[in-house]
Amino acid sequence: GDLVIIGRGDPNISGRVLPYALKTQRTPPHTQILEDMADQVARSGLKTVDGDVIGDDTYYAFERYAEGWALDDLQWSDGAPVSALTFNDNVVFINVLPGDRAGDKALVGVEPETGYYELDNRIVTSAAGVTRRIGIHRDPGAKKIVLWGTIPLGDAGTKETLAIEDPAEFVAQLFRTLLERRGITIRGKTRARHGEGAQFFVASAVASQQANVSEASAQDSALATNTPAAAGDNSLPSSAPVQGTPADISSSNKVLAEHFSTPLADDIRVINKTSQNLHAELALRLVGKLRGSGGSFEGGIAAVKQFLLQAGLKDDEFTFLDGSGLSRRDLVTPAATVQLLIYASRQPWGAAFEESLPVGGVDGSLADRFQNTPAVGQIHAKTGSLSHVNALSGYGQTAAGKRFVFSIFCNNHNMPGSKVLAAIDSIMQVLVGDGQAGKK
């Protein structure tokens, strides 16, 4: 039958080191979790799969992108698609090195290499000292990546990230490659199995975990066959085509391998410290799933709205269409943001939330800001950045030890982002200095 790898929303099937400390660290290979699962399958004694290798992400509704996301974001890591079967933040790495001589084609490769993407390499090696200029493009729905430009002799090379349009299909292809390296024969195709959208899931999703959010962070990615293998049988018999119904691990499936995620609290730090959009979107789906919506945008946003109203925000102070803030149609006022931060500070989980925020001059998205100023270590805040938009909201402490909450939004500006950030940072230094900056 088919061999199915089922995603349950774990965002950290990658080489990311957890818990997060100061900066993102990755331990190669970033395929290690899938390598371990492939080892489990090999140890099970399986030798042949007569059916297909299927990447199944039906645990969440099939809604890869949110309303209001810009088309030019979708090719890159910031706009990586949402999938219950997520690998490596749903990006591949494109490695580029210069050739041996000026005029030679550059050396390019995809990491991990699975044969899923075709590279059209038009990058030429230029003379030493010439500025590197590289362009990368993938059309929506295409598996050809076009690369062009120049890279000079002696250049150390570059690693670019490119979003994977169908993560479930990519994981299926990658896992097939790992199984074949272990001597397992695959006779069928490689494909993805998606759900039929939010409405389908509202009616049909199987709530396989009855748990609160912290317990449900141990979501698993498991391999299961849709028919049990007989005792001593080292092959999976052929089966009927899959119709796209929600998949789950049940008595009719034989589990060959499984992996459990790290605690959800670890990923909250990743989301807030590094502004990890995809992980924020997956957290939104998890909230919706636990509220019985089947893991849809709509269900997650409904739960968030209920929470915000409970926190004291007014209905006309916010509109959200995604979990990351990437949508241009997300709206919220600075006053509402301050109200939310005050509410959070008074909750039992408030201290943990504040600790998950970037620290000025120390880590995350604020590591390089406030350097050599009294504000270093005194600001715990979340950044927000889109083209023509910059924001900073969070908690601060003055030189006299007074704590304060703040939210600064700069919208629809046409200035270099560096100048806007400098202005925001100047405001923060005044606040941290008890308003003394600039006084004589």
Residue ranges and their predicted role:
Residues 32, 274-277, 281-440:
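Small-residue-rich helix-loop
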Residues 1-315, 399, 422, 430-439:
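Conserved serine DD-peptidase/penicillin-binding transpeptidase domain
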